[in-house]
């Protein structure tokens, strides 16, 4: 009789009570061909420990929030102090004001901000606000960019970029997504064609300025600046979804790196320090349309709760210290350089890239440009699955999808990075 791990046993039990056994699909490890996910018992610093007491170097960081590493002492202390004063009030608190001020200080394109409970809520609310502000209904998103699971975002491109979006999940009515237009990332021709066809109907463009749900694809040839220009020419708004990149690739987010000003920005992940949180903000004249200042409705029972606000305040205080992002970026660069050198040593078709505390792994030659969702689909996805399994078996926890970016924290040591490179080198040698 096969001896099953505690993770296997828990997964079987979970499937009896939770659809698919998980509360977010990617966690099931199905996309990488694994029979079961690892159930985590606890985490500290750069490490995860599963229910079978296996230790992993964690390069997911709860999908981005844990920029300080798990259970940072200062964040924990701040949360513990607040817990004694209450978990949630359903009323305004000083922590909301303090976190809002800190975000606005660090991201100058945000003049006012509204807190919500998730990235999905943030993007959904930003779209509603853009539609109300412009009195238009159509939005443009990009194939491969993920903005949460609101109905208007769950679309796939039809036959060519000029197609109206088609639902890619059952339960999403075609009428809901008929106003969602899908373009190709890094392709201005597809954007120009949409504006030519729907010139006075487009409320906004929403984009991940660095596409972290296509592994990690950077904007090319001033793509973001060109989007800013075409939005200005057509009185449409530009929304940067920085739920992933905000306070992760740089202190001022991707918009500070590319020096492009969005009208609205969505945030999440890092601003909650590991607690559930989201936010959307931007120009004051637009944000003043949000209720109760204006007519655009948005509300939430736990929005701005003092626990999440406290965790966010302490996290932003720490990452805004001089030299933090230099150190974080150096760690990511050390990892990426080591992986690229290892692949080159064995003539293995692989390359990696990074920015700030975020990195991407591509199973193709560095001579092959990966600038779109279609490009990524042409890489060796099966080889990624093999790499994932090998690294997991040897104590390295990577994102369980070739379409997801990875994250490094300030808690990762040189030894952690060197072990990761060593294991990758062995894989490249053997494959």
From Swiss-Prot:
Alphabetical UniProt keywords: Cytoplasm, Isomerase, Porphyrin biosynthesis, Pyridoxal phosphate
Catalytic reaction annotation: (S)-4-amino-5-oxopentanoate = 5-aminolevulinate
GO molecular function annotation: glutamate-1-semialdehyde 2,1-aminomutase activity; pyridoxal phosphate binding; transaminase activity
Subcellular location: Cytoplasm
Cofactors demanded by this protein: pyridoxal 5'-phosphate
Biological process, per Gene Ontology: protoporphyrinogen IX biosynthetic process
UniProt keyword annotation of Magnesium present: no
UniProt xrefs under SUPFAM superfamilies: PLP-dependent transferases
HAMAP family in UniProt: HemL_aminotrans_3 (MF_00375)
Protein name: Glutamate-1-semialdehyde 2,1-aminomutase
Organism: Francisella tularensis subsp. tularensis (strain SCHU S4 / Schu 4)
């Amino acid at each position: 009789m096969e001896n099953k791990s505690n993770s296997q046993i828990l997964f079987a039990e979970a499937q009896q009570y939770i659809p698919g056994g998980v509360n977010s699909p990617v966690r099931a490890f199905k996309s990488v061909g694994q029979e079961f996910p690892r159930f985590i018992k606890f985490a500290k610093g750069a490490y995860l420990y599963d229910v079978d007491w296996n230790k992993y170097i964690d390069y997911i960081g709860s999908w981005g929030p844990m920029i300080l590493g798990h259970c940072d002492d200062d964040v924990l202390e701040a949360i513990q102090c607040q817990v004694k004063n209450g978990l949630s009030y359903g009323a305004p608190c000083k922590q909301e004001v303090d976190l809002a001020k800190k975000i606005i200080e660090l991201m100058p394109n945000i003049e006012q901000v509204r807190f919500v409970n998730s990235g999905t809520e943030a993007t959904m609310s930003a779209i509603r606000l853009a539609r109300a502000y412009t009195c238009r209904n159509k939005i443009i998103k990009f194939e491969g960019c993920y903005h949460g699971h609101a109905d208007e975002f769950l679309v796939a491109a039809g036959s060519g970029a000029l197609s109206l979006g088609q639902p890619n999940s059952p339960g999403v009515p075609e009428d809901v997504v008929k106003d969602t237009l899908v373009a190709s990332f890094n392709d201005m021709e597809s954007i120009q064609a949409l504006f030519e066809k729907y010139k006075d109907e487009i409320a906004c463009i929403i984009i991940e300025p660095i596409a972290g749900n296509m592994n990690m694809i950077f904007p090319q040839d001033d793509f973001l600046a060109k989007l800013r220009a075409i939005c200005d020419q057509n009185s449409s708004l530009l929304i940067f979804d920085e739920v992933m990149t905000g306070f992760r690739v740089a202190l001022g987010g991707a918009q500070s790196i590319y020096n492009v000003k969005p009208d609205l920005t969505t945030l999440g992940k890092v601003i909650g320090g590991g607690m559930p949180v989201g936010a959307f903000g931007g120009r004051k004249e637009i944000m003043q349309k949000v209720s109760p200042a204006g007519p655009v409705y948005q509300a939430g029972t736990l929005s701005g709760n003092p626990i999440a606000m406290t965790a966010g305040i302490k996290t932003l205080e720490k990452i805004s210290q001089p030299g933090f992002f230099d150190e974080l970026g150096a760690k990511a660069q050390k990892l990426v350089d080591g992986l690229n050198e290892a692949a080159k040593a064995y003539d293995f078709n692989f390359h990696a890239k990074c920015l700030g505390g975020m990195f991407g792994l591509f199973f193709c030659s560095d001579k092959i440009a990966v600038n779109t969702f279609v490009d990524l689909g042409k890489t060796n996805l099966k080889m990624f699955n093999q790499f994932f399994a090998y690294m997991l078996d040897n104590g390295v926890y990577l994102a369980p999808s070739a379409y997801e970016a990875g994250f490094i924290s300030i808690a990762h040591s040189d030894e952690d990075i060197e072990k990761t490179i060593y294991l990758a080198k062995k894989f490249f040698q053997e494959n």
